Amino acid sequence: MFDHVTIRVSDRAASQRFYDTVLAVLDIEKTYEEDELPEWDDWSLTAAGDGKPVTRRLHVGFPAASRAKVDEFWRIGVDAGYRSDGEPGPRPEYGDDYYGGFLLDPDGNSAEAVHYAEKLRDDGTVDHLWIRVRDVAASKRFYELVAPFGGFEQRFDSPERAMFAGGTGSFSVLSGEPTENVHLAFATDDNATVDTFHAALTEAGYRDDGPPGERPIYHPGYYGAYVLDPDGNSVEIVNHNR
C-alpha cells in the first residue's frame, strides 16, 4: 500500500538499533542505508532537526510469519531493554485470529509484530498504521480526497475510527492526542497524477508542503508533491519514473 513511511527521530543511531534488533526477528532486512536514511522496504527513519521535529504517538504494525515470531519479537525487545507496550497474545477486538505483541521505540512510538492467518504481507514491510487525530471526520474527509490518487479506499467507518486500505496494507485515523510529524507516501505511475493530487488538495484548502516537481536528491526521475493533513502530517504522491 505504502511507497514509504518515514519517521523523524531524536537519536538516529538509537532508533536504528531498536529497529535493527526487532525487525531482524521478523526476517525484515534493511534495504538501504546511505545519507543517514536507513530503510527497511517501505519503512524508514531520519534524524529530526531544526524545523523538522520528532514523530510522536504513531503506531506501526509489522507482519510476523507465526505467533512464535510475535513472541520472539517482544521477548528480544524487552531483553534488550526496550519498553513493552503490550505483551504478546490474542487481540480478538481486531480479529478472531489476530495475535500481536507491542514495544515502544526510543521516542515512544508503538511498534507491533502481528500475525493473522488470512494474509501476510509480501509487498513491503508495513502491515498497518494507526494515526491519532483531533477530528476523525475532518481527517476522513482529507484522506477520502487523497484516496483515488494514492490507490487506496475506505474500508471501515465509525465516529471514532476510519480505516483505509489498499493491497494488503492499511492505515486508520482514530480519535486521540494527535500523531505528529509522520510522513506517508503513496506511489503512482505518472507525473500527471502527482500534479492533479496537489492541485485538488490545495484547491480544497489543505496546506501545501511542497509543489509538484523532480527531487533528484532522492534519485533521478523522482517526481513528487506534498500536502499536510489536518494535523500537520506530510502526505506525498510520488512517481519514481523507473
Which stretches of residues belong to each language-model region?
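Vicinal oxygen chelate
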Residues: 78-125, 153, 163, 203-242
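N-terminal beta-strand motif that seeds the catalytic metal site of vicinal oxygen chelate
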Residues: 1-16, 60, 114-140, 151, ...
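Conserved active-site tyrosine of GNAT-family acetyltransferases
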Residues: 15-19, 77, 108, 139-143, ...
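Core segments of cupin and vicinal oxygen chelate
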Residues: 6-45, 130-170
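Long, continuous compositionally biased terminal/linker segments
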Residues: 32, 38-80, 162-203
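Short glycine-enriched loop/turn motifs at secondary-structure junctions
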Residues: 1, 53-56, 95, 123-125, ...
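Generic non-transmembrane alpha-helical segments
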Residues: 21-26, 73-80, 145-150, 200-204
